Amino acid sequence: MTKLTITRPDDWHVHLRDGDVLTDTVRDTGRYMGRAIIMPNLVPPATNVDSALAYYERIKAVCTTNFEPLMVLYLTDNTTAEDIRAAKASGKVVAAKLYPAGATTNSDSGVTDVKNIYPVLEAMQEVGMLFLVHGEVTDSSIDIFDREATFINNTLKQVVADFPSLKIVLEHITTKDAVDFVMGASDNVAATITAHHLLYNRNHMLAGGIRPHFYCLPILKRNTHQQALLAAAASGSKKFFLGTDSAPHAKDRKEAACGCAGSYTAHAAIELYAEAFESVGALDKLEAFASFNGPDFYGLPRNTDSITLVKRSWEVPATYPLGDTGVVPIRAGETIDWQVED
């Protein structure tokens, strides 16, 4: 296959950051994504409807396409049921996000114990707001490669049991454990999968030298988990959909003695997913994963226009602009096999 036309995709998990970098991040994500779920882990985080709506306006102010940001509340131990009801009433906030305190970038204000937000989850279940989950424990005694599976067993299974009508997205899954859990759970439980977790495993990050631009959270796992993710994405199951978790950091914040977690893929997201699906002979499953399963789960209409991918190799720049600095993208200086037709 040398050409593939699909319904315009959406990104159900992206970090746009804030301030002077928005022009660059919104350009890259909005180039061919119709909508995106915007992560709220700013400094300070978007913890209430007012801060979420103000962030929405800052994003829209730099949009040059019809791209529509879908806003998310950042949950804390102090979030209230009234915060949820106000966010739902806004029409712009579609979900609320659990960051276990300290799990990832700018998560220090997150939830210290999920039981602290049970009244909030009750309100979310009542009003029909989705619950997005960064599924890792933060206990320093738990091996970093085991933190997702431990979170599922110790926390998420109980939440799913306690809130059977709550729609839950386990974000950026990285393990066979997560695939099996989502597949075995009710139709109210789904997951996003990133392009980099489909294309890479921990050998790419650690073998033959440390490659900091592959360092993200949840961390890349062994190749058996990568294969499980590919099988899930290409299975045709409606429970899995596109979420890039594209997370820009300035070059010097990544190439450092203590580098930041996050991989940048917004420059070529759908192209990278096309490579991943092609690698398992499943290009025919890409459209549902990228364009149908997400809006269907969120109860939103599918996009009505389309994009066309062509099999044409192109070289990725060494950096992309990021405010007054630069971000090193995944596949920098290398080629990608697919390209979106202008």
From Swiss-Prot:
Subunit (UniProt): Homodimer.
Catalyzed reactions: (S)-dihydroorotate + H2O = N-carbamoyl-L-aspartate + H(+)
PROSITE patterns in the cross-refs: DIHYDROOROTASE_1, DIHYDROOROTASE_2
Entry EC number(s): 3.5.2.3
Residues noted as binding Zn(2+) 1 in the record, renumbered to the chain: 13, 15, 97, 245
Keywords assigned: Hydrolase, Metal-binding, Pyrimidine biosynthesis, Zinc
List of catalytic residues: 245
Domain of life, source organism: Bacteria
Function of the protein: Catalyzes the reversible cyclization of carbamoyl aspartate to dihydroorotate.
Disulfide bonds: none
Cofactor: Zn(2+)
Name of encoding gene: pyrC
Cofactor detail note: Binds 2 Zn(2+) ions per subunit.
This protein's name: Dihydroorotase
Pfam families: Amidohydro_1 (PF01979)
Gene Ontology terms: cellular component: cytosol
Gene Ontology process terms (BP): 'de novo' pyrimidine nucleobase biosynthetic process; 'de novo' UMP biosynthetic process
Similarity section: Belongs to the metallo-dependent hydrolases superfamily. DHOase family. Class II DHOase subfamily.
Residue ranges that the Swiss-Prot or TrEMBL entry lists as coiled coil: none
Organism: Shewanella loihica (strain ATCC BAA-1088 / PV-4)
A molecular-function term among this protein's GO annotations: zinc ion binding
